[in-house]
């Protein structure tokens, strides 16, 4: 059963994505779609994560990335620094005991963006570190307390891509380790 906070996050994320997608699809149809990931590019986005942490069926999160350096000696790619956060929540019960879990992974990755001839597609791979904020409680008729889990540092490895369907908006997806197994969402260009 999802918490009311998790339901509110899902509703707000869905509403923002629907409004943004509608506006950007109209703009893309008017202007024609072209990708533009390059030096100085900055975006922000929302994602839904699937798989990866305990009994959570989905997570909700955000992404921010800034392209900081051209790498002519490494295939002429671009180095981007990405900050990410996600929110997972779930509960379970068994033989009179109930558990409640909340995970909030916050991480930073260095992403290498491959240069392709197709400007609408932006593939990347990334490595980084994160900090997992964990809250877990157990309760029964005779005992209430924590679950013994603690927050801590974790490693991140991911591969993903953007597909630009307008100059300022892209579909986003990544797979990897460190949080959700699969994240999908939408990013919006800021600069």
Positions of PLM-derived features:
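Outer-membrane beta-barrel domain signature
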Residues: 33, 49-53, 72-74, 94-99, ...
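Residues on the lipid-exposed face of transmembrane beta-strands in outer-membrane beta-barrel proteins
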Residues: 46-50, 62-66, 108-112, 127-131, ...
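Residues that define the transmembrane beta-barrel architecture of outer-membrane proteins
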Residues: 40-42, 54-60, 77, 100-106, ...
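Short loop/turn motifs that connect adjacent beta-strands in outer-membrane beta-barrel proteins
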Residues: 29-40, 69-79, 115-122, 165-169, ...
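Transmembrane beta-strand segments that form the barrel wall of outer-membrane beta-barrel proteins
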Residues: 42-52, 80-87, 127-129, 163-179
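Cleavable N-terminal export/targeting peptides
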Residues: 1-36
